């Protein structure tokens, strides 16, 4: 950059560039995603370094056919960086927020038990779980990542407290990485029961 001669005048000498991306981690992530649309990101929250940022479907920049397919719509979403631009249901990561809200709400939270029978019915809707965990405490349910336990706990905690803890955790906000804003997260439980 040269203010006198022009904004983007080419200089005779180059500059060094160091990336924090780990090619092995990115390759493993890409292989793990296979043909599924999705993203894998590994971000060091202490330093701001991005270790892995993989988004699929992807394309080969050196293959003109791939680029043409993308223009024709056959490759829907290949130019979307899903790590920065897409939003996803938080899934099991939201159990941390539910647990924190439960700890804040109930003095007996560590003794409080719920039953998992491969899931649980909440307001006429079946919430399935990957296991049949039986009666368990918060600690056991967290270790099992039990959907049934955390669904029942969320109902008992209530909409207002869950919303409060989701806001504290950064939901409904965006963040920037090196000046690039990520998609704003979205959390709305206004249609749920109290």
Regions found by a protein language model. Name each.
Residues 2-39, 46:
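Conserved, well-ordered alpha-helix/loop/beta-strand core segments that scaffold catalytic motifs
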